[in-house]
Every structure is written in structure tokens, then in C-alpha cells.
């Protein structure tokens, strides 16, 4: 595929999606599916939102992994930000899942000294 991410980036994105699926208690395959029920869609949107926080993660790479167009990923991210501002229960869920995923969002490569 045109925007296929590196193996390292694939692993990081998959780790975020897997952690979110475990937190929500639904299989990873369900998050990556075309299902549109509210629980699955929320988990998918949150996965995309948190994957965008990975250093050097690009929308096309996240879209490649989630089998979505990169514009759909941008929409998901914007929806999560809107829900966070307008729905206090969602904001609490987002905080919980973010705390669970946060260690995966840290850069793992140490900068090289020149």
C-alpha cells in the first residue's frame, strides 16, 4: 500500500489499538471492523485519537493500520476532542484509557549524540 508505515510504527500503532481494545473489553478485530455500534465506534475513535499522539505517527499510517482513509482518522480525532469538551462521562473514560495507554506513547528511540 502507498502509505504503509515502517514495522516499528506498525508495532506502536498496534500496541495502542490493542491496549484500547483491552480497556474497552472488546476484541481488536471488532475495533478494526466496519461495525458502527456506539461502543465499537467510540473505542475505534479513541484508538485513532491516541495513536495520533505517538511521536512521528502520520495520519496515513494510522489510516493504513485501521483500514480507514486518513481523513476519516482526522474526523475521529476531532470527534474525540469534541466529545471530551461536551460529555463529562466520556471525558472520564478518555482519561482512564489514556492513563492505560500513556506508557506506549513515549518515544523509545534515544537521540544520538553528535
Please annotate each region the language model reported:
Residues 59-65:
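Short alpha-helical "recognition helix" segments of helix-turn-helix
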Residues 69-74:
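Helix-turn-helix DNA-binding helix
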Residues 17, 84-107, 113:
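Short Lys/Arg-enriched helix C-cap and helix-to-coil transition segments
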Residues 41-57:
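Short, amphipathic alpha-helical "recognition" segments used to contact nucleic acids or chromatin
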Residues 22-44:
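Short, Lys/Arg-enriched anionic-surface-contact patches
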Residues 1-18, 110-114:
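General nucleic-acid-binding
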Residues 17, 58-59:
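Helix-turn-helix DNA-binding elements, focusing on the entry/boundary residues of the two helices
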Amino acid at each position: 500500500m502507498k502509505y504503509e508505515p515502517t514495522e516499528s510504527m506498525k508495532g506502536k500503532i498496534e500496541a495502542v489499538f490493542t491496549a484500547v481494545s483491552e480497556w474497552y473489553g472488546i476484541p481488536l478485530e471488532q475495533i478494526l471492523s466496519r461495525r458502527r455500534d456506539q461502543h465499537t465506534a467510540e473505542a475505534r475513535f479513541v484508538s485513532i485519537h491516541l495513536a495520533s499522539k505517538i511521536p512521528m505517527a502520520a495520519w496515513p499510517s494510522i489510516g493504513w493500520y485501521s483500514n480507514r482513509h486518513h481523513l476519516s482518522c482526522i474526523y475521529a480525532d476531532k470527534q474525540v476532542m469534541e466529545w471530551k469538551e461536551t460529555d463529562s462521562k466520556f471525558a472520564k473514560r478518555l482519561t482512564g484509557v489514556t492513563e492505560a495507554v500513556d506508557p506506549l506513547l513515549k518515544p523509545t528511540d534515544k537521540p544520538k549524540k553528535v
